[in-house]
Amino acid sequence: RPHVHPPPEHQPPLEHPPPEYQPPHEKPPHVHPPPEYQPPYQKPPHEKSPYEPPPQEYQPPHEKPPQVKPPSEYQPPHEKPPHEHPPPEYQPPHEKP
């Protein structure tokens, strides 16, 4: 009888510790280094900038200002002027004194 091993139900809990105790995987984040270290390698492209600025100086002219005219087309009032002058057909009589 003494050899009766205790109930296995009591042993399983001890074998697998609660998952809450498991660390939150702090190691994965360590794999990716800080992004601050990457900018240094982006500096090389900066050398191209010297030739890029020239083209930008040519844009200042901005001859697109005419684009502001488009809104003018939206002015429906323009249709009224034609109404002001009556049809010339009624003027013929005026030609004969």
UniProtKB/Swiss-Prot annotation:
Annotated region described as Disordered, given as residue ranges: 1-97
GO biological process: nodulation
Compositional bias segments (type: Basic and acidic residues): 76-97
Induction (free text): During nodulation in legume roots after Rhizobium infection.
Key words, A-Z: Nodulation, Repeat
Domain of life: Eukaryota
Skewed-composition ranges (Pro residues): 9-22, 31-43
Family statement: Belongs to the nodulin 75 family.
Role this protein plays: Involved in early stages of root nodule development.
Name of the protein in its database record: Early nodulin-75
Gene source species: Medicago sativa (Alfalfa)
